[in-house]
Amino acid sequence: MNIPTVDLTDLSSNEPARVERGAAALREAFGVFGLVYVKNHGVDTQALQRFYDSFATFVARPLEAKRSSGRAEIWYQRGWTPPNTEVAVAGNGQPDFKECYFAAPYPTDEASALEFPNLYPENIWPPDAPPFFQEGLLTLGRSLHEAGLELLRGAALAMGLPHSVFADLCQRGPHVTRALQYLPLSGSQVNTGILWGEEHTDFNLLTLLPGGRFLNPQGQPAPGPDDKSGLYLRTRSTPEEPQGRLVRGSSPSGCIVAQVGQQLEILTGGTFLATPHVITAPGVPGWQRQSAAHFMHVHTSTVLFPLARFRTPEAVRNYAPPVLAGTYDIKTLVDIGLAPPSALDQLGYRHYDRLNRQRAGGSKV
């Protein structure tokens, strides 16, 4: 299986032939596989390893020492997410065996935060964060975001659209960078069907993955303990392979991975499909895995519906009705267990009790 690799310097080139080469790679990658390998991406891999070291130091702290950095009241959209919190929408209800840390790599948009405060909260940092924790996560997020913008411009050209269409939609969006550490299984848990993260698709526009690493039972970086554990991505179904194919998410040397999210699928009417992916656990106890992801979102005021170019009757049936991206985000965060069900009460008219209060107060109309 030949998943295309795109060179970001092709997409930013002044030479039309190079730009078209990059766009053609994205057309095939996102249209057939839902993901692409990216080289010359600008992510500092040495800094990434240094950040992973810092994050491992944080995760190793007792749970009580980390609780002040976890905020359920903002739906864990910033700061620490404790283990057994998030679930996959299309999974079997098993909470993920992981700890996470969320941060927005850019300053919060104040106007958007007034409308969707839980999607645009301020960053939270441990008061005694390990060295390079904050700087490392923010620098990683910004590097991945810049690479993502270039990919979105290339994806627009690949679809015959003005190059800025997708990039413009995500200006001031609720972008977030997440560090993850998948936790060790005990001897009684391995080979029992437990997954580090159940199969799911991301609900955002585009996800950038800089690559992860395993930690052995002594907490040291090491090659994976077997050939079955780690990130796997499911390709689009074909007549020959109706279930698609699970491919290992390890990219060629020096590359990162970008995968399509639900928002990009909706905007393209299914021309690009969101990438299902699963994180499998090793068959031996004591191992952990570290990874990171940057989630690019369209702005919360964007209407999620196929763009005019893709608005066929079939696409309308598949993706109607149109929905505000901020509403979509809230609904999904409830579905995956990060936001409480009561968050859905925000999505409709909230003043039905006004007449009752008037009646109780003796008002006459």
Question: Where do the protein language model's features map onto the residues?
Answer:
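Peripheral, non-catalytic segments flanking oxidoreductase cores
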Residues: 1-365
